[in-house]
A protein has these predicted regions:
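Chalcogenol-based redox active-site neighborhoods
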Residues: 1-131
Length: 131
């Protein structure tokens, strides 16, 4: 999410809005949003309904979490682009921006992803911290 935080102004300049969805409880999501300084909305899907409906549910990790995914949805709700990824391979914002800026002819590349040490520490803290 940090990469998308860093690209948020470019995403907005392209006329798009960014919303993230987490299966974490609201208090955990609020803490993560503060810790990462996320300028975009972080919605909570604690019953995992949305992640199941969008086919990104991963029941094998931490009692069921969402796989990393990016969806570009038009204002008329048509899906322009989707990428459902693995933890170590994802589409980066720099590769999504051309889709937002043009008529959708670009297709982003996936990159190997290695979370930063601070990201690991925050994730572990969120797992062990109550509420």
């Amino acid at each position: 999410m940090a990469e998308y935080r860093d690209a948020y102004s470019q995403i907005r300049a392209a006329g798009a809005e960014l919303v993230a969805i987490s299966v974490d409880a609201p208090a955990q999501s609020a803490r993560l949003r503060r810790q990462l300084g996320l300028p975009f909305t972080l919605l909570c899907d604690t019953d995992r309904r949305v992640v199941r409906e969008w086919h990104v549910y991963n029941p094998r990790e931490h009692g069921g979490i969402a796989r990393p995914a990016v969806f570009v949805v038009e204002t008329d709700l048509r899906l322009r682009f989707s990428s459902v990824d693995r933890v170590a391979t994802r589409v980066m914002p720099a590769d999504v921006l051309p889709i937002l800026q043009d008529a959708g002819t670009s297709q982003p590349r996936k990159h190997a992803y290695m979370p930063r040490l601070g990201d690991f520490a925050r994730a572990i803290g969120n797992l062990v911290s109550p509420g």
